[in-house]
Amino acid sequence: MVIKAQSPAGFAEEYIIESIWNNRFPPGTILPAERELSELIGVTRTTLREVLQRLARDGWLTIQHGKPTKVNNFWETSGLNILETLARLDHESVPQLIDNLLSVRTNISTIFIRTAFRQHPDKAQEVLATANEVADHADAFAELDYNIFRGLAFASGNPIYGLILNGMKGLYTRIGRHYFANPEARSLALGFYHKLSALCSEGAHDQVYETVRRYGHESGEIWHRMQKNLPGDLAIQGR
């Protein structure tokens, strides 16, 4: 186990998460007693307590007052906030994780973009207009792309879509910085944003689904060609 945390709390958090991932602390079992675990990791019990509370909030553990702390099946109990952690834990599975993430984005955006155009076209156009002033480099496009999808999610009037995008932000923007380093990807995205703007202006809500699906397919093809050069820094760094 190689841990690169920058603080005792960060080290303890990574130690426990990696132990759960590697089945040293399997789901459904209980953690060692607090004193034993603090000595094992090499941190104070106060630090360990804070870490356990944070991991419980993220769904890794269930703290049962008066009972031992239980290890959860994190796939069933955690939220989107652990995406970056999963990418760090299993780099070989990152391409599949990203494919799943982008598939979810495409599927839900066909719904919330169409709703935004129907119910709040002025807000949607305001969001899409930000594409007219983007600088032609990867970081700017990564930020723009995330903000456009997130902005349209909130423009739909259903904030839950926006919260889903919030949960994707960390890994999503890391992917974007790599993906948008490709000029072809930037060109395709601009064409997509402008097409959406035209559909919104025309009230052509029925064309949103096919437009978004086509963009998902075409951008996916570019992404798959780039995956062989996937950088290792897509995963979150130690604390």
From Swiss-Prot:
Protein name in UniProt: Fatty acid metabolism regulator protein
Organism: Escherichia coli (strain K12)
InterPro entries xrefs: FA-response_TF_FadR, FadR_C, TF_FadR/GntR_C, Tscrpt_reg_HTH_GntR, WH-like_DNA-bd_sf, WH_DNA-bd_sf
Superkingdom in the source lineage: Bacteria
Outcome of swapping S219A: Reduced ability to repress
Protein localization: Cytoplasm
The keyword DNA damage belongs to this UniProt entry's keyword annotation: no
GO terms classed as biological process: fatty acid metabolic process; negative regulation of DNA-templated transcription; positive regulation of DNA-templated transcription; positive regulation of fatty acid biosynthetic process; regulation of fatty acid metabolic process
Description of how activity is regulated: Binding of FadR to DNA is specifically inhibited by long chain acyl-CoA compounds, but not by long chain fatty acids. Long chain acyl-CoA binds directly to the protein preventing it from binding DNA, which derepresses genes for beta-oxidation and prevents activation of genes for unsaturated fatty acid biosynthesis.
UniProt cross-references to Gene3D superfamilies, sorted A to Z: GntR ligand-binding domain-like, Winged helix-like DNA-binding domain superfamily/Winged helix DNA-binding domain
UniProt remark on domains: The N-terminus binds DNA, the C-terminus (residues 83-239) is responsible for dimerization. The C-terminal domain binds acyl-CoA.
DNA-binding region: 34-69
Subunit structure: Homodimer. Binding of acyl-CoA alters conformation of the dimer, separating the DNA-binding regions and disrupting DNA-binding.
Function: Multifunctional regulator of fatty acid metabolism. Represses transcription of at least eight genes required for fatty acid transport and beta-oxidation including fadA, fadB, fadD, fadL and fadE. Activates transcription of at least three genes required for unsaturated fatty acid biosynthesis: fabA, fabB and iclR, the gene encoding the transcriptional regulator of the aceBAK operon encoding the glyoxylate shunt enzymes.
Induction (UniProt): By growth in the presence of long chain fatty acids (C14-C18).
Result of changing Y215A: Loss of FadR repression
Region named Binds acyl-CoA: 215-230
Keyword vocabulary terms for this entry: Activator, Cytoplasm, DNA-binding, Fatty acid metabolism, Lipid metabolism, Repressor, Transcription, Transcription regulation
Domain spans labelled HTH gntR-type: 6-74
Record annotation: effect of changing K67S: Dominant negative to wild-type, decreased DNA-binding
CDD domains reported in the protein's UniProt record: WHTH_GntR (cd07377)
Residues that hold CoA according to the record: D99, S103, V104, R105, T106, N107, R213, S219
Recorded GO MF terms: DNA binding; DNA-binding transcription factor activity; fatty-acyl-CoA binding; protein homodimerization activity
